[in-house]
A protein has these predicted regions:
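Domain-level marker for long, solvent-exposed, non-transmembrane regions
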Residues: 1-189
Length: 189
């Protein structure tokens, strides 16, 4: 839950501060201002991805260390968490029965502190999608795909958890010339 909040809030903040949608697309036009070609600006898109990943890593490292002076708790959506506990890192307390995978005892027993550590593995990619949108129009979409691996450290064992998400970054509707004649291929025999 905390990972989801931190990732989405971090992406929102980077997009809000760094993104200029018009720089993500390269549109070539002819002399009549008609669109010849649309391409994605790989340099700008990769800069955006790099900033997102670096900011997520920095936020996780600062939270793990308990260094709250370098993060904005409200910006990351962590204002409801106990700040005293956040200074120790991300720690949850779960009943002992859950650790032994026993459903009957899952809510009983003493609670055990569990510290969540980032495994140091955040990978990201950019996906693009072009969809037909009416007659001679196209909808261009750019999304950031992230995969984050974490270790949950229990007193008895450690478990690796994976978190994947795809976040839309930009959408742009490109309008082409509407033809004088359009045949949509429907054959009514």
């Amino acid at each position: 839950k905390v990972t989801n909040i931190i990732v989405h809030r971090t992406v929102d903040k980077v997009i809000e501060k760094e993104l200029d949608i018009d720089n993500l697309y390269i549109i070539n036009r002819d002399n009549n201002k008609n669109i010849n070609m649309i391409d994605f600006n790989a340099v700008e898109v990769n800069k955006l991805l790099s900033k997102v990943i670096n900011n997520i890593q920095n936020n996780f490292q600062n939270i793990e260390k308990g260094d709250l002076s370098k993060i904005n708790i409200e910006e990351l959506g962590l204002e409801n968490y106990d700040k005293k506990n956040l200074k120790k890192g991300i720690i949850y307390r779960i009943p002992l029965g859950i650790i032994f995978n026993n459903t009957l005892l899952s809510n009983f027993g003493p609670t055990i502190p569990i510290k969540i550590n980032l495994n140091g593995n955040i990978s990201g990619s950019i996906s693009t999608k072009v969809t037909n949108y009416g007659i001679n129009n196209a909808l261009l979409e750019i999304s950031i795909n992230l995969e984050i691996n974490q270790l949950v450290m229990l007193p008895i064992t450690t478990e690796k958890l994976s978190f994947k998400t795809s976040i839309p970054v930009a959408m742009k509707l490109i309008q082409g010339i509407v033809p004088s004649y359009y045949f949509n291929g429907i054959d009514k025999n």
